[in-house]
């Protein structure tokens, strides 16, 4: 993903020897992890899989040590607890740490539900609350989360071609 590569180019120090948390780490998209070196990387997802270290819902994951960076790629449109997941990610972030995400934006076709293409999100099909949940996200969805105000110097990108929303910001 160009956004991840751009972030690494601008903030290369975060991709060497740092501690990362990735929510939704088992999905099939390219990861920031592949751009990192000697980082401690904890991948969290709702089912066992490649890149998954901890099986947990994103909003329920707990760890006593803060992270230098937290990320989620193409996850929030599938998460009915999206606001709680974002809050939890920010709570796990060190002051000055990076919050980075991508998700589906307005106009993106529904995917990963029993109505659309269940094979695209196999984990969610076994979870009643999740299997038919889908919502494209906007910057306003994130800004409405009280904890999101803890992030500063935010940078939003809307990719009109893929209908994706990208964001990176720093915890106060």
What are these regions (language model features)?
Residues 80-90, 94-172:
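S-adenosyl-L-methionine-dependent methyltransferase catalytic module, highlighting the catalytic core
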Residues 1-15:
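Class I SAM-dependent methyltransferase Rossmann-like catalytic core
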Residues 11-16, 26-29, 129, 136-143:
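N-terminal start-of-chain detector that recognizes signal peptides
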Residues 15-109, 167:
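Conserved SAM-binding loop
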Residues 5-8, 26, 41, 127, ...:
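Sparse, context-dependent recognition of short Cys/His-centered cofactor- or disulfide-binding micro-motifs
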Residues 12, 64, 158:
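Residue-level marker of regulatory loop/turn positions in helix-turn-helix DNA-binding domains and
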């Amino acid at each position: 993903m160009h956004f991840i590569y751009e972030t690494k180019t601008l903030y290369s120090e975060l991709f060497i020897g740092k501690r990362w948390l990735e929510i939704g780490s088992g999905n099939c998209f390219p990861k920031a992890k592949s751009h990192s070196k000697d980082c401690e990387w904890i991948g969290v997802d709702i089912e066992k899989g490649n890149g998954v270290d901890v099986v947990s819902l994103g909003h329920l994951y707990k760890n006593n040590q803060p992270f230098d960076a937290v990320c989620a790629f193409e996850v929030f449109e599938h998460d009915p607890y999206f606001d709680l997941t974002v809050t939890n990610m920010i709570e796990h972030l060190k002051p000055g740490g990076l919050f980075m995400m991508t998700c589906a934006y307005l106009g993106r076709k529904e995917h990963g539900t029993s109505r659309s293409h269940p094979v695209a999100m196999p984990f969610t099909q076994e979870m009643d609350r999740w299997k038919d949940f889908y919502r494209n996200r906007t910057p306003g969805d994130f800004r409405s989360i009280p904890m999101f105000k803890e992030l500063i110097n935010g940078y939003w990108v809307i990719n009109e071609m893929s209908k994706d929303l990208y964001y990176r910001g720093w915890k106060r």
